[in-house]
C-alpha cells in the first residue's frame, strides 16, 4: 500500500464567529454601567478589519479587554488580532483598527516547513499560497508532525484541515 496521506496547515479566521464575538461584546458594552453615555462601539469594517471606537484610551482598553474575552468564549484565538495604533477620531473620541490575520505568510511558512523538515520524519512539506501541504506515506508520521506543530509557541494560530 503505497498510498500518500496528507493534510494542510492553515491559519484561518471564522468570520461568523468574529461577528458573534463582536455582537456579544457590543451587548456587554451597552449594558455595562461604566459605559453609560459612552460613544464606545465595535464594528467590522471589511473582511479583515475591526474598528474599535471609544471616548478615551482608558475606555478603549476596556473595550479591547471585552473583545478579547468574547473571542476566547467563541473559541477564536487572540493571535489572529493585530492591533494598530490608537488615533484621534471625530467628536473627541479615539479609534483603533484591529486587523484579523489569516493565511500563513512567506516567512512564517518557511519557518514551519524548516521545522517539519528538521524533525527527520519521512514527510514532505510544501508551501502552497497561504497554506502548507504536508504529505507522507505513514499516517503516524503525519500525526507526529501535528503534535510537533502544536507544541511550538507560534505567534499565529494554526489549524489542521483536509486530512486524507
From Swiss-Prot:
Keyword flag Lipid biosynthesis: no
Gene Ontology MF terms: nucleotide binding
One GO term describing the cellular component: cytosol
Pfam families: DUF520 (PF04461)
Domain of life of the native organism: Bacteria
Taxonomy of the source species: Bacteria, Bacillati, Bacillota, Bacilli, Bacillales
Record family assignment: Belongs to the YajQ family.
Key words, A-Z: Nucleotide-binding
Protein name in UniProt: Nucleotide-binding protein BH2387
Signal peptide: none
Keyword Nucleotide-binding among record annotations: yes
Function: Nucleotide-binding protein.
Amino acid at each position: 500500500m503505497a498510498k500518500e496521506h496528507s493534510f494542510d496547515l492553515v491559519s484561518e479566521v471564522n468570520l461568523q464567529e468574529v461577528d458573534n464575538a463582536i455582537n456579544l461584546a457590543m451587548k456587554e458594552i451597552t449594558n455595562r454601567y461604566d459605559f453609560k453615555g459612552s460613544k464606545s462601539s465595535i464594528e467590522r469594517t471589511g473582511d479583515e478589519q475591526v474598528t474599535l471606537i471609544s471616548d478615551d484610551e482608558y475606555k478603549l482598553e476596556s473595550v479591547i479587554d471585552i473583545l478579547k474575552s468574547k473571542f476566547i468564549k467563541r473559541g477564536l484565538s487572540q493571535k489572529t488580532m493585530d492591533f494598530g495604533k490608537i488615533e484621534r477620531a471625530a467628536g473627541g473620541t479615539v479609534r483603533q483598527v484591529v486587523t484579523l490575520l489569516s493565511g500563513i505568510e512567506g516567512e512564517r511558512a518557511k519557518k514551519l516547513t524548516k521545522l517539519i523538515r528538521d524533525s527527520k520524519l519521512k514527510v514532505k512539506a510544501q508551501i502552497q499560497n497561504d497554506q502548507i501541504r504536508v504529505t507522507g506515506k505513514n499516517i503516524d508520521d503525519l500525526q507526529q508532525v501535528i503534535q510537533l506543530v502544536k507544541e511550538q509557541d507560534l505567534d499565529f494560530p494554526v489549524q489542521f484541515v483536509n486530512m486524507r
